[in-house]
Amino acid sequence: MLKSASPMAFYDIGEQQYSTFGYILSKPGNAGAYEIDPSIPNIDDAIYGSDEFRMYAYKIKRCPRTRSHDWTECPYAHRGEKATRRDPRRYTYCAVACPAFRNGACHRGDSCEFAHGVFEYWLHPARYRTRACNAGNLCQRKVCFFAHAPEQLRQSEGKHRCRYAYRPVRARGGGNGDGVTMRMDDEGYDTSRSPVRSGKDDLDSNEEKVLLKCWSRMSIVDDHYEPSDLDLDLSHFDWISELVD
C-alpha cells in the first residue's frame, strides 16, 4: 500500500469532488467512448512530456483542433475546460492554493497570486517534479506531477515567491466553530517550503494543527457547480493522495 499524503504537501481535494472537476466530450448514446483521431496530439509523445512543455504549455496553449475529442487525452487547453492554466511566466502567482477559488468565485481572476486548481498547483515550476513518485517506474499515470527517477527530480525555482502567507488568527466571537479565522500577512512566502511555515517566525504546535485543519477543508470545486454532460470524470486522480508522502 502506498503511504497516505501529508496534509502539508497539498491542499485537500475530496475524492467525491473529482467527478466534477473539468470537462469531457462523449459520443451521443455511447457515454465515455471516443473515436480515435490520429491527428490529435498524443499526450504520450516525448515533447509533451518534457518539463518545459508540462510547466509552460500543458493546458495553457490553445488546442488547434476544432472537432470534438477527449480533452483528457489532449495536452492543450480548451474553451470552458476547468483544467486550463495560466502561464506562470506571464502571470505572477505562486504554488499555494487559492482559498477563494474553492468556492468558484475568486474575484481577482487571472491577477490572483495563488494557484487556481490542481494543475496550476502541481505543474507550477515551484512544485512540478520536486518530489519523488512513490510508484516509481510502476506509475501508469499519463500525466504525473512527480519524478520517477533521480535525474527527473527538479530543484524548486526560488524566483517564484508570493507576497502573502496564511496564518491562523484567534477570532473574538463569531467565526467558525473553532474560533479561528484566516489572515493574510504581507510578507515573503517561499513556495518551495511547507505552507505551514513562512517568514522568520515559526508557528507553534497548536497553530500548526489549526492551520492544517483549515487546509484540510479546502477544495478546488465550485460549491454551487452543477454537473453537466460535459463534465470530466477525473476519478483517476485519486492517485494524488497516494503518491505524496
Swiss-Prot record:
Q: Does the keyword Metal-binding apply?
A: yes
Subcellular localization, as worded in the UniProt entry: Nucleus
Record GO biological process: cell differentiation; embryo development ending in seed dormancy
Its GO CC terms?
A: nucleus
State how it assembles. Interacts with MARD1/FLZ9 and RD21A.
Instruction: Print the miscellaneous field.
Output: Plants lacking PEI1 produce white seeds in which embryo development does not progress through heart stage.
Role of this protein: Embryo-specific transcription factor required at the globular to heart stage transition in embryo development.
Protein name, as recorded = Zinc finger CCCH domain-containing protein 54
